[in-house]
Amino acid sequence: MTTTNLSAVADPLRLYDETFASRLLLGTARYPSPQSLEDAVRVSNPAMLTVALRRQSAGSPEGGAGFWKMLRELGVPVLPNTAGCYSADEAYTLAQMSRELFETDWIKLEVIGDDYTLQPDTLALPAAAERLIRDGFKVLPYCTEDLVLCRRLLDVGCQALMPWAAPIGTGRGPTNPYGLRLLRERLPNVPLIVDAGLGVPSHATQVMEWGYDAVLLNTAVAQAGDPVAMAQAFAMATQAGRLARLSGPMPERDVAQASTPVVGLPFWHAEEKQA
């Protein structure tokens, strides 16, 4: 089976009641130009494009009728988010506005609890998620790798989670590998998307090898020297990590083990080993 067939047909990403061919989600902010964003989307073929309603304005390159027209023409599903919200009420209101504007029930839920780390508010996040799910939203909550928080989000009705790898925009990669791997182990049947903190394609490959279902990127692509090439690199890295996971990596060993069999070697090699 080719990797193309694996991605598009045999191994789709399943979120709520929908399936997606790609396991990469892409943000739309901070690109050098609208053209670079458009080109990055075309080469990476993401499952969804995240859009922060609060950050858009008619006078910015990321806002206005031209921006929305470009998104529609790309034909990629839009995932609005509640970036910049600091309370459950604020996030709820912005989500309702996003639903009306984008005509979608999808929402990436962000409720920030700390300005310095942009860490999610672990109390307000489940409360906001519960309200939105009651209203029919398909909520993808931005959270940490905290297992208790993640279980609480599942309890209120979330069917997928988006734990961070590191604080937003840092590009540090997974700062708590143990916690992320444990979360994957304890929630084996829950779609998990690593959101925030990935900086280079190898980070995406790593978390996909751990069994994560998808990755979401923005700054790592938008602020790269060549955003289009980086978008393509991340798409390939994500697919490589997924294929490696499904292929069953060899177990790690503490001691060396020869990869070349000794059967059939000349007799004097056997004598040397016995000596």
UniProtKB/Swiss-Prot annotation:
The keyword Acyltransferase is annotated on this UniProt entry: no
Binding, 1-deoxy-D-xylulose 5-phosphate: G169, A196, G197, N218, T219
Molecular function per GO: thiazole synthase activity
Biological process, per Gene Ontology: thiamine diphosphate biosynthetic process
Transferase as UniProt keyword: yes
EC number: 2.8.1.10
Reactions it catalyzes: [ThiS sulfur-carrier protein]-C-terminal-Gly-aminoethanethioate + 2-iminoacetate + 1-deoxy-D-xylulose 5-phosphate = [ThiS sulfur-carrier protein]-C-terminal Gly-Gly + 2-[(2R,5Z)-2-carboxy-4-methylthiazol-5(2H)-ylidene]ethyl phosphate + 2 H2O + H(+)
SUPFAM superfamilies registered for this protein in UniProt: ThiG-like
GO CC field: cytoplasm
UniProt pathway: Cofactor biosynthesis; thiamine diphosphate biosynthesis
Subcellular location: Cytoplasm
Domain of life (superkingdom): Bacteria
Keywords in alphabetical order: Cytoplasm, Schiff base, Thiamine biosynthesis, Transferase
Active site (catalytic residues): K108 (schiff-base intermediate with dxp)
UniProt cross-references to CDD domains, sorted A to Z: ThiG
Subunit structure: Homotetramer. Forms heterodimers with either ThiH or ThiS.
Family statement drawn from the similarity comment of this UniProt entry: Belongs to the ThiG family.
Name under which the protein is recorded: Thiazole synthase
Gene: thiG
